[in-house]
Amino acid sequence: MLIEIPEVLTKEQVAQCRQLMDAAEWVDGNVTSGSQSALAKNNMQLPEGSPVARQVGDLIQDALGMSPLFISAALPLKVFPPLFNRYEGGQAFGTHVDNAIRQLRGTNFRIRSDLSATLFFSEPEDYDGGVLTIEDTFGIQEVKLPAGHMVLYPSSSLHHVTPVTRGVRVSSFFWMQSMIRDDAQRTLLFQLDGSIQAIGAERGAGDPEVIRLTGVYHNLLRMWADS
């Protein structure tokens, strides 16, 4: 399941974050690569744990916590602190799959990567290329979203970023461990939650069918969830 989540950050927040990031020091993006990714990766990255990365990352995590669409789609258990990359001058990221396990450097914090996310900090018209192309059971999807918008997709997906031939592409990328390991089960719960919300808006939260379906949702969540 691939989900676009609009306006995770406002345009004002994006501008403030870009001001901080544009003034920061960037390093070779391979500092966070696995062995496979290192062969395909050519970009720059904010150092993990840098003050700017922490500040903007905290803002992103706070915003995600207030996004009903994100919570419904991801059912997050743990979120890896957001990282940040920058592409320009022909830089690209070849086809790869994300590592199954991610550990935060110098800590015992680690997650199973069930879902991957990219949050855009550059407007589509400000750069050429830089298309995130994702391959999975839903087919091949090309993603290039407005600044402040985010895409969420299974970490098991093959994906790549096409060369940036004009301008600069800045984004945040991170992973999360969902309470629901299986993508098909997570998709079913997301669809069921959406139907409950739609019926509830039409009939009211006290409608017997809304109550019954809400019970079904929570019983499935109870059956499948890790916590």
UniProtKB/Swiss-Prot annotation:
Requisite cofactors: Fe(2+); L-ascorbate
Keywords annotated in UniProt: Dioxygenase, Iron, Metal-binding, Oxidoreductase, Vitamin C
UniProt superkingdom: Bacteria
Record note on cofactor: Binds 1 Fe(2+) ion per subunit.
One MF term in the entry's GO annotations: 2-oxoglutarate-dependent dioxygenase activity
Chain sites annotated for binding Fe cation: 96, 98, 159
Fe2OG dioxygenase domain ranges (all copies): 78-178
UniProt-listed Enzyme Commission number(s): 1.14.11.-
Binding site for 2-oxoglutarate: 169
One biological process term in Gene Ontology: DNA damage response
Broad class of enzyme this protein falls into: oxidoreductase
The keyword Iron is assigned to this record: yes
Protein name: PKHD-type hydroxylase Mfla_2317
Organism whose genome encodes this protein: Methylobacillus flagellatus (strain ATCC 51484 / DSM 6875 / VKM B-1610 / KT)
Lineage: Bacteria, Pseudomonadati, Pseudomonadota, Betaproteobacteria, Nitrosomonadales
